[in-house]
Amino acid sequence: MNKEIIIGDWKMPECDTEASMNMWNARAQEFAKQRGVEDDDWVAALVKRHGMLPADGTFLDVGCGAGKYTVYFAKKCAEACGTDFSEEMIKSAEQRAREAGTDNAFFSCDNWHTLELAEKGWKGKFDFVLANMTPAIQSAETFEKLTEASCGWCLYIHPVLRTGSVADRLKKKIFGKKPDPRYPQLQYAFNLLWEKGLFPAVEYREHNWVRSFELERAVDIFKNDLKSKRTLTAEEEASIEKYLIEHAVNGIVEEEVRTTQFALYWEV
């Protein structure tokens, strides 16, 4: 698969940016509650094993969310920077850094899809660039920015398979078909790097979890997730709310998420 085909296939989907931002802002509280990263974490162990981040190096966390990896790796290097387009996520990340007493972690609210690395002063700046389970990477262009921002290593983590017990049913209900659980990003990303003459490596893991939302937040989150894909009618929005009300238990909506994730890493 050559670069022209990949660029044509892997391009930014049409989406409602405002709805997407609203969804991630609504989820900031959930992400803020995630416990900090430990040394035996899959990502942390992989980075250490391959010596991706020198002690005097710089780190960029693309789509940092509430900053758990930014704060963790700040303790391992000279300077860490997290970027995310959700203002609420950035606020949560800054709070996490303060609570951890980390004074070399910095955060920036940006849209990676439109960010100009040169204008930001980020071109070739970072010894290690991480994009972990983030919608910041949605096209060949947004993926290639990882390499452009790095002067050392990059690590890209994303599902190859993913199912969500609530989200999948809602997508089938609204869009008329069950979403394909398979993701093509690994094939695209690997081939883009190979075309550049780089030698990426890949590892996999199974990772499953249950997430819980109070009903009102669940309605907000799932509705904005679907609205980010296309405009919803009033009837469709009402149908989403009705489904969640019917499936809530004691005012709580639970979703089982099952994934097979890949970790693609390469040296620039």
List each language-model region with its residue ranges.
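Conserved class I S-adenosyl-L-methionine
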Residues: 1-53, 155-180
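Class I SAM-dependent methyltransferase SAM/SAH-binding core
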Residues: 60, 68-114
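Conserved glycine-rich SAM-binding loop
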Residues: 65
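A short SAM/SAH-binding and catalytic strip from SAM-dependent methyltransferases
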Residues: 126-141
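A short glycine-rich, Lys/Arg-flanked "PGG" loop and its adjoining helix->strand segment in the class I
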Residues: 140-155
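Short alpha-helix
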Residues: 182-197
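Conserved Class I S-adenosyl-L-methionine
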Residues: 201-268
